[in-house]
């Protein structure tokens, strides 16, 4: 690598996101960066834990220009935990099934090249984030049934795509019971039972 790492982007790729779309979109991203002579280091791993460890190691040893995440909301969440403490800019190239974080920010879901041009040529813009139990979130914090279903869906190897969530709902709903919450909002505290509570940071 001829350039210093401070001029280099880390490109974190989840090849399995979006039913395998992540790999192809990752190739589009790296091809575009090559065409613009942008210095970058691709980072991929077999699991989210391995990817997180690799990114943490790289960012602790050197300074980088930022992180470009190619994946869905899970990868965006993972990268946030690394970028925030290091004050690193980051961008998400949508390649997941939901892409809620990208939709919340109004970023383009299809035109990757013009989006990347903005990423590498303009100054980063600050955004609001939420924090819960020392973890950062960008779009929505979900608790209760929603998070249980998401965890179950992520553990399923079949079926692929959005249908996993329908299967996960069918598996979890019969045994799920409401959770008691204590909520403080605008200075008022109250308790209630609910299937889920979601906190939105955006539209």
Can you say where each PLM-predicted feature lies in the sequence?
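ATP/NTP phosphate-donor binding region
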Residues: 1-67, 77, 81, 188
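Short coil/turn segments at secondary-structure boundaries
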Residues: 66-71, 88
């Amino acid at each position: 690598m001829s350039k210093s790492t401070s001029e280099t982007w880390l490109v974190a790729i989840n090849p399995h996101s979006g039913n395998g779309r992540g790999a192809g979109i990752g190739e589009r991203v790296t091809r575009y960066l090559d065409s613009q002579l942008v210095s970058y280091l691709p980072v991929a791993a077999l699991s989210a834990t391995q990817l997180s460890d690799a990114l943490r190691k790289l960012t602790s040893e050197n300074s980088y220009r930022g992180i470009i995440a190619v994946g869905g909301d899970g990868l965006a969440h993972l990268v946030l935990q690394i970028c925030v403490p290091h004050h690193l800019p980051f961008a998400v190239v949508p390649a997941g099934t939901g892409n809620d974080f990208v939709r919340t920010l109004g970023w383009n879901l299809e035109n990757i090249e013009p989006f990347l041009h903005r990423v590498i040529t303009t100054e980063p813009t600050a955004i609001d984030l939420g924090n819960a139990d020392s973890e950062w979130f960008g779009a929505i914090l979900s608790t209760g049934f929603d998070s249980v279903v998401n965890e179950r869906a992520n553990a399923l190897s079949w079926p692929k795509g959005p249908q996993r969530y329908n299967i996960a709902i069918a598996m979890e709903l019969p045994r799920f019971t409401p959770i008691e919450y204590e909520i403080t909002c605008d200075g008022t505290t109250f308790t209630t039972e609910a299937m889920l509570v979601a906190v939105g940071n955006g539209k």
